[in-house]
């Protein structure tokens, strides 16, 4: 039987060092099984991998952190057209609670997105997660788009790598203040920053 989950909604500057330490450990345990490289950004007390979120939804239960979703408002470009979005990312859920699901996190974050006045929530997921996120699309919560390339800056400027990378990821769009029909058509999204 699962313990009761309670959500904490907080701005980034409300987190204490102890929160970052606990979150970093959560991400190392969550992302580590998918490869040591995926857990590496969370060494020490660093609780973000690429861009740092401005707002977090953190679920707790009797065992500690159960789930996390970060958001960051930013302007992206879709084939050159500017669009304000709230990027959703840095999603994680403890393995013993995987049935809690991303839909629960989105339901908690949606009122925050409405308060912030953004037209869309936006995120990317790797193609291997297509079946997982497609279920959410069937429920009308979001739309999954494929065939769109996404350009992002690297977190760090490195001497041996270009400053940007291009991914063929699945694009997840959550209509918030505008209908999905207002999402611009296009084949290239410029994130204009590091992935959340």
From Swiss-Prot:
Keyword Ion transport: no
Substitution effect: residue 77 to R: In strain: ORS1096
Keywords: Acyltransferase, Cytoplasm, Nodulation, Transferase
EC number assigned by the record: 2.3.1.-
CC annotations in GO: cytosol
Protein purpose: N-acyltransferase required for nodulation. Acts in the production of a small, heat-stable compound (Nod) that stimulates mitosis in various plant protoplasts.
Protein name: Nodulation protein A
Species annotation: Mesorhizobium plurifarium
């Amino acid at each position: 039987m699962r313990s009761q989950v309670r959500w904490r909604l907080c701005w980034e500057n409300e987190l204490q060092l102890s929160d970052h330490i606990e979150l970093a450990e959560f991400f190392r345990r969550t992302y580590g099984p998918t490869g040591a490289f995926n857990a590496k950004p969370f060494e020490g007390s660093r609780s973000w991998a690429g861009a740092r979120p401005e707002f977090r939804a953190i679920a707790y239960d009797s065992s500690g952190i159960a789930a996390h979703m970060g958001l960051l408002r930013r302007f992206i470009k879709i084939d050159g057209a500017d669009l304000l979005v709230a990027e959703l990312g840095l999603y994680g859920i403890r393995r013993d609670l995987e049935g809690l699901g991303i839909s629960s996190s989105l339901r908690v974050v949606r009122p925050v997105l409405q308060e912030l006045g953004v037209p869309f929530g936006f995120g990317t997921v790797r193609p291997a997660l297509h079946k997982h996120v497609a279920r959410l699309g069937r429920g009308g919560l979001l739309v999954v788009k494929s065939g769109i390339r996404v350009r992002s800056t690297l977190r760090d400027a490195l001497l041996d790598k270009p400053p940007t990378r291009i991914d063929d990821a699945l694009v997840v769009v959550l209509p918030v203040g505008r209908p999905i029909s207002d999402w611009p058509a296009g084949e290239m999204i410029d994130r204009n920053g590091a992935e959340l």
